Amino acid sequence: MLKNSLSGIAVMFACCAISMQPATSAQGPEVVRKVLMQHDLPMPGWSEALVSVEIPVGGREGRHTHPGPLLVYVTEGAITLDYEGQPSKTYKTGDTFYVEADKIHEGINMGNVPARALASFVTPKGQPLTTQAK
């Protein structure tokens, strides 16, 4: 049961890790994010969030980080992940990926249909889900 609870929490935090601010016009079409659920975890000092994300064709999130781990499940389309220190990788419908805390990354939709995902964020309480990279 604890394992399931921790998995659920990790999923929630990953969602929060996704930037909650829309992409700027310089980054292409606007990325849409919606917090579906957010609450404190039973672990002192931590909270979690589950976020739906839609990246339109040609859209990009902008380079950013999260203060905690992020788990992402791609529900439609494909997301190309540019991840600090690694080659870009494309994740398609049904794929999952993990982003470490404080690692600069960016999700990009290079496909011909909108990309949608569920992201779970686990973050220190009171911290923003996402911080744009400098």
Please give the residue ranges for each predicted region.
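Ligand-binding loop in jelly-roll beta-barrel domains
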Residues: 88, 102-128
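Extracytoplasmic
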Residues: 46-50, 66-69, 86, 102, ...
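Short acidic-glycine-tyrosine-enriched beta hairpin
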Residues: 55-56, 85-102
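Histidine-centered metal-chelating micro-motifs
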Residues: 60-62, 80, 97, 101-108
